[in-house]
Amino acid sequence: MTVAIVDFRPDHAAAWAQLNTTWLIEGGFAIEAKDRVAIDDPQGVFLDKGGRIFIAEKDGEAVGCCAMVPTDDGVEVCKMTVTPAARGLGLARRLLEACEAAARQAGAVRLYLETNSALKPAIALYESAGFVHLPPRPTPYERADVFMEKRLQPSRTRL
């Protein structure tokens, strides 16, 4: 078994759409307008804005993903999921670490995310990675009721 975290390529578009649609539906969440745009146009929503999308591959198959996009004061981490069959391999943590490393390299001082209180394993992952809870705030997502951040010290090395 080979697992890897790779940058999004155009040939990942169908897997990106499937991964994100599946976690929303299986979680009992509506696919909101902002979700639809991100699912249908990852290039425009993330990459063209200076963000990154990471894909977790297991034996060459896309089994997870996570995106990051610059914000006014850091980077927002979003659209993280790993298929049920690939859970337990540490891929969600590796995806989150890839986002954090890229954010540090870009000089970001803050990671921010929004999630739902029903997603207990995700919240536990974020807490274990050093994220702290924030007070509720306005959000375009109806499902978002948990807000978290992690303050970063920028990387001292440049690649």
Name these PLM-found stretches.
Residues 2-4:
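Extreme N-terminal starter segment of soluble prokaryotic enzymes
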